[in-house]
Amino acid sequence: MVYTEGDINLVNTCLTCNYIYLDTKERKKFAQSSHEYLIQQLQINNYPIQGNTSIPLTFNHPVKELMWLLQSDSVLQVNELLNFSGQKKYIANSLPSNLKYNQFLRPHLLDKAKLTLNGQDRTDWHDYNYFYYVQNYESFRNCAEHFAYIYSFSLNPWNLLQPSGSLNFSRIDNASLSIKVNKDKVNTLNPAIIYIYAVNYNVLRIQSGMGGLKFAN
């Protein structure tokens, strides 16, 4: 299989929805009552990187888990928008005759990482295996090849109905994620972008036909 460069054009999109219809009495009761729902939100920090660095985490609210992905410019240049490894997915049109045995292995862009809160290390330096394999298995029983690194503050982050732990970033003055990268894949000649996601809890209030969040940023 070969790759070809070119823009990705969305020809058509659709949205699938589920509707719940209420009868007149139920609709009146629902409209006149106040409601509070525990919801989850997603916060995102994106930063360009060219080597080892410390990235400030500007999040708010009780966060149940952090997830981050690194993406090199080399894969973006061939429009592999969902490739977060250090190797293009597809083979080039022309190949040299002296290929190495590991030519098409997909290495990780992350080497090591640690999390720091208010000047105190929440974690020691761990290599990517800890955040990729151990945290994925402990939190989600997941070993898919997605190149997403995770750190969970919750015992069961997959449980959407019952929180089991979080870190209130609104009470943290300084939080940072320090990373060491695979220098063969991320450097000044081949920079990358790190995408950091935080899943947090909030409360959605609905009253008198109006909705809003209980806790603002």
Segments from the language model and where they lie:
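Flexible assembly/topogenesis modules
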Residues: M1-N217
